[in-house]
Swiss-Prot record:
Keyword Secreted attributed: no
One GO cellular component term: small ribosomal subunit
Pfam families: Ribosomal_S14
Protein name according to UniProt: Small ribosomal subunit protein uS14
Domain of life from the UniProt record: Bacteria
An example Gene Ontology biological process: translation
Species whose genome carries this gene: Picosynechococcus sp. (strain ATCC 27264 / PCC 7002 / PR-6)
Subunit structure: Part of the 30S ribosomal subunit. Contacts proteins S3 and S10.
Family in the record: Belongs to the universal ribosomal protein uS14 family.
Sorted UniProt keywords: Ribonucleoprotein, Ribosomal protein, RNA-binding, rRNA-binding
Lineage of producing organism: Bacteria, Bacillati, Cyanobacteriota, Cyanophyceae, Oscillatoriophycideae
Amino acid sequence: MAKKSMIERDKKRARMVAKYAAKRAALKEAFNNAADPLEKLEIHRKIQNLPRNSSPTRMRNRCQITGRPRSYYRDFGLCRNVLRDWAHQGLLPGVVKSSW
């Protein structure tokens, strides 16, 4: 189980990313369309002045149950440990144990 503070920190980052997503996308679009190097520099400064945690790169995928940050399966939103337990219990529709 991950520390509650780390889980809450990631939730805060997710809220921050959602809040600034439109502004960041507009600035990036303007940056890509700008022809003048000075204009590009000014837009780049505006992007840099956005909060650091508003960047999607700083978000970390975590297991919804345990908060574990590693071995995360996007399709399920779970870590491998919970995925294995739930699959054995039959709680994941369509997931079957492999045999060949």
